[in-house]
């Protein structure tokens, strides 16, 4: 199942479909009144759809801190039975972590409808002025922690947000670094977990030759990569004795074995048959816990295998890097899946329709997964924390995090008006399906007219390498974009991010080479705007639409900033 917000701009595409929709519950006197109300709700951003296998539900819902308040429901396709309908609508409420699923009516309900709601677990809240029937939802949440080595700091950032929202789990499943983080989360000591990741370096994980490492991050990356390669070839993997020592110093075996909930399960791979082994940690003897955690995290051949009772075990990622199936088998009806993009096998499974899967995965690269760098750990902690905050509705944005995105929408509407009225350019491209498809491919997410302002602003920030590890006001992000245009910032950026992986180093080099050419293009666009060369600008929009559009948007935003208007020497 898939749930999406529906926007007013989609009416042209969806109108004929909605005209076939039938009202399921008596919110309005007629089906047509129900349809009309749905489109009016798009103005308040309260219109939604849930896409199932045989039908789609279109509904009006108001999200409050505790409940999903439903005020209208229409169905297109096969009419679901009542049991299926209530399961699906409650699935939507659970998807947004709501305590209650509620229905609101304007007029009193007949005995038939009251009986139907009561039969499916709903009760009327008589203390409210409105007619509201609600059901308290039950959760059996499984936290699924994937493998990914040094990327694991991201998972602790996610957990920090979950603790702030008092979201608890019944089951934790972890592979590799997910197993290590799983046992930290099981002990419920956030400060310990944060402190560990903020101070964790490669020499605390792997036993490598003691050599002086360069202060230059690029040179250090090459040094540590070579050391690991030698260890893999000569010794069959680097020893993880430092990690074993660190883990044992953090484990509270007595506390772990007393914990009844959540239950922790780790995944490792047995040699030589490469069999997946799922281990219930709280059913082990106290002296076995560290062994099975380390077995799951032994990324052979970069790291040596783990020997337990005469058997060899290596990283669980060789068989099941994202153990969603283990969580479902152990009773999870909701799975919060924290994927940190580690190497390994993602097992193909069919998630039951009644199970709510929440995927938390960074749009951004998390760096190298074998080199542990304190600054990069801190950066990834922030990314995980902010991504989960967005998932829970605390902030907005996709690539970046915003307190509010309303101003971005306003800037975009004014910019389109500026193109037409001031520059006298045609903007018919926004009416073309190809424009939207290309934009979605570039942005890597759904984009409609109402969200285009945020998408274009985020693409501009990405283009200028603005960092995503903080919450922005829209004007603050614009100021960051403009500053990146006018100053050398690579050293400062890398100091804040920490160690990069090989692909990131290549992208930085590529950007440095392209920077002069991109600045030349911006200057050329600025010259055409100043000289009112509208035909040439229109031609560039036809031949290089997105590059030209982003450059025009950058120039427009620059002129709109109050500090720029007051201090023209900054241009």
Located regions from the model:
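Short glycine-enriched nucleophile-adjacent loop
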Residues: 176-187
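Short amphipathic alpha-helix that is part of the acyltransferase structural core
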Residues: 1-37
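Acidic-aromatic/histidine active-site loop/patch
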Residues: 83-87
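Patatin-like phospholipase
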Residues: 25-45, 55-67, 72-77, 82, ...
């Amino acid at each position: 199942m898939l749930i999406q917000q529906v926007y007013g701009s989609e009416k042209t595409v969806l109108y004929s479909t909605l005209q076939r929709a039938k009202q399921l519950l008596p919110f309005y006197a007629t089906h047509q009144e129900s349809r009309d109300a749905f489109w009016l709700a798009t103005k308040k951003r309260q219109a939604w759809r849930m896409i199932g296998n045989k039908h789609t539900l279109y509904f009006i819902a108001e999200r409050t801190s505790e409940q999903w308040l439903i005020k209208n429901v229409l169905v297109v396709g096969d009419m679901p039975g009542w049991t299926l309908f209530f399961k699906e609508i409650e699935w939507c409420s659970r998807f947004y972590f709501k305590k209650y699923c509620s229905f609101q009516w304007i007029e009193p309900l007949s005995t038939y409808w009251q009986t139907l709601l009561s039969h499916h677990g709903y009760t009327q809240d008589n203390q409210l002025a409105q007619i509201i029937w609600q059901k308290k939802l039950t959760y059996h949440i499984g936290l699924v922690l994937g493998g990914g080595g040094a990327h694991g700091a991201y998972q602790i950032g996610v957990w920090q947000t979950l603790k702030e929202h008092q979201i608890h789990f019944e089951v934790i499943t972890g592979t590799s670094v997910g197993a290590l983080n799983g046992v930290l989360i099981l002990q419920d000591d956030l400060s310990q977990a944060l402190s560990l990741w903020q101070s964790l370096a490669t020499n605390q994980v792997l036993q490598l030759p003691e050599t002086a490492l360069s202060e230059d991050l690029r040179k250090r990356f090459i040094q540590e990569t070579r050391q690991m390669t030698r260890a893999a070839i000569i010794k069959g993997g680097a020893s993880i004795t430092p990690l074993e020592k660190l883990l044992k110093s953090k484990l509270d075996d007595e506390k772990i074995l007393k914990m009844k909930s959540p239950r922790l399960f780790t995944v490792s791979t047995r040699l030589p048959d490469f069999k997946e082994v799922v281990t219930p940690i709280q059913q082990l003897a106290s002296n076995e816990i560290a062994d099975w955690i380390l077995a799951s995290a032994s990324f052979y051949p970069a790291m040596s295998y783990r020997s337990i009772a005469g058997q060899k075990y290596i990283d669980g990622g060789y068989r099941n890097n994202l153990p969603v199936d283990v969580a479902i088998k152990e009773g999870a009806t909701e799975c919060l899946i924290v994927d940190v993009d580690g190497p390994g096998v993602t097992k193909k499974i069919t998630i039951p329709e009644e199970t709510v899967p929440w995927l938390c995965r960074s749009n951004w690269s998390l760096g190298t997964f074998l080199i542990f760098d304190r600054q990069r750990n801190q950066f990834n902690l922030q990314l995980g924390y902010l991504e989960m905050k967005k998932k829970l509705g605390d902030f907005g944005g996709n690539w970046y995090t915003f307190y509010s995105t309303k101003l971005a929408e306003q800037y975009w509407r004014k910019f389109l008006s500026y193109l037409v009225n001031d520059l006298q350019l045609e903007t018919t491209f926004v009416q073309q399906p190809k424009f939207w498809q290309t934009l979605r491919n570039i942005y890597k997410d759904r984009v409609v007219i109402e969200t285009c302002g945020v998408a274009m602003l985020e693409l501009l920030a990405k283009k200028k390498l603005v960092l995503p590890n903080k919450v922005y006001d829209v004007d603050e992000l614009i100021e960051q974009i403009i500053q990146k245009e006018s100053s050398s910032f690579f050293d400062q950026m890398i100091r804040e991010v920490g160690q990069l992986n090989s692909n990131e180093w290549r992208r930085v080099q590529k950007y440095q080479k392209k920077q002069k050419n991109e600045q030349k293009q911006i200057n050329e666009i600025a010259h055409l705007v100043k000289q009112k060369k509208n035909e040439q600008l229109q031609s560039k929009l036809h031949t290089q639409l997105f590059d030209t559009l982003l450059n025009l948007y950058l120039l427009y935003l620059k002129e709109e900033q109050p500090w720029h208007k007051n201090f023209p020497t900054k241009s």
